[in-house]
Amino acid sequence: MSGGKYVDSEGHLYTVPIREQGNIYKPNNKAMAEEMNEKQVYDAHTKEIDLVNRDPKHLNDDVVKIDFEDVIAEPEGTHSFDGIWKASFTTFTVTKYWFYRLLSALFGIPMALIWGIYFAILSFLHIWAVVPCIKSFLIEIQCISRVYSIYVHTFCDPLFEAIGKIFSNIRINTQKEI
């Protein structure tokens, strides 16, 4: 560490030698990551979003894909004028498109804020209230389950075993009379 220049395995030039074990907070992380084949962790808040495919998990495939043909249809023998049909199609499609954009512009960010708060509260309650309550219940119920198990093995098992032996010798013969 005399201030000399060093070259690492990838050819990068640096002044202070890098520890082979990794940084001081995670000793052996460099060697362990290669040995354990750990994946690189990405922060969910800094990931890029896809502006083309906005439903990558196909949440709304069957619900909101409503086109003109799904709502308005004229059966054979009952047709309006072609111009009216084309104008209706255009009016429906453009109105749906721009009204959705208007609603998204007005209410999209407030609704995202509300749903973000809601799911944050839900996650918080699940992590800090629900799971600890269930774990404590399971710990507390364990002593009751032991007492119940002793009761069943002491009283119920012999009783039902005796009843089973009583009814095990019953034989039924059926005869068919003509």
UniProtKB/Swiss-Prot annotation:
Chain positions with N-acetylserine modification: S2
Annotated region (Interaction with CAVIN3), positions in chain:
82-94
Cytoplasmic side stretches = 2-104, 126-178
Give the record's intramembrane annotations as residue ranges.
Answer: 105-125
One annotated GO molecular function: oxysterol binding
Note down the stretches annotated as region Interacts with SPRY1, SPRY2, and SPRY4. 149-160
Binding partners and assembly: Homooligomer. Interacts with GLIPR2. Interacts with NOSTRIN. Interacts with SNAP25 and STX1A. Interacts (via the N-terminus) with DPP4; the interaction is direct. Interacts with CTNNB1, CDH1 and JUP. Interacts with PACSIN2; this interaction induces membrane tubulation. Interacts with SLC7A9. Interacts with BMX and BTK. Interacts with TGFBR1. Interacts with CAVIN3 (via leucine-zipper domain) in a cholesterol-sensitive manner. Interacts with CAVIN1. Interacts with EHD2 in a cholesterol-dependent manner.
Q: Where is this region: Interacts with SPRY1, SPRY2, SPRY3 and SPRY4?
A: 131-142, 167-178
Its function?
Answer: May act as a scaffolding protein within caveolar membranes. Forms a stable heterooligomeric complex with CAV2 that targets to lipid rafts and drives caveolae formation. Mediates the recruitment of CAVIN proteins (CAVIN1/2/3/4) to the caveolae. Interacts directly with G-protein alpha subunits and can functionally regulate their activity. Involved in the costimulatory signal essential for T-cell receptor (TCR)-mediated T-cell activation. Its binding to DPP4 induces T-cell proliferation and NF-kappa-B activation in a T-cell receptor/CD3-dependent manner.
> May I have one GO cellular component term?
membrane raft
**Keyword Repeat annotated:** no
Single GO biological process annotation from the record: regulation of cytosolic calcium ion concentration
| Cross-link Glycyl lysine isopeptide (Lys-Gly) (interchain with G-Cter in ubiquitin), where in sequence | K5, K26, K30, K39, K47, K57
Q: Which family does it belong to?
A: Belongs to the caveolin family.
Q: Which Pfam families match?
A: Caveolin (PF01146)
The entry's localization annotation reads: Golgi apparatus membrane; Cell membrane; Membrane, Caveola; Membrane raft
Lineage, broadest ranks:
Eukaryota, Metazoa, Chordata, Craniata, Vertebrata
Q: Spell out which residues are annotated as carrying Phosphotyrosine.
A: Y6, Y14, Y25
Q: Which residues carry this modification: Phosphoserine?
A: S2, S9
Q: What is its main location?
A: Golgi
The protein's name = Caveolin-1
Keywords on record: Acetylation, Cell membrane, Golgi apparatus, Isopeptide bond, Lipoprotein, Membrane, Palmitate, Phosphoprotein, Ubl conjugation
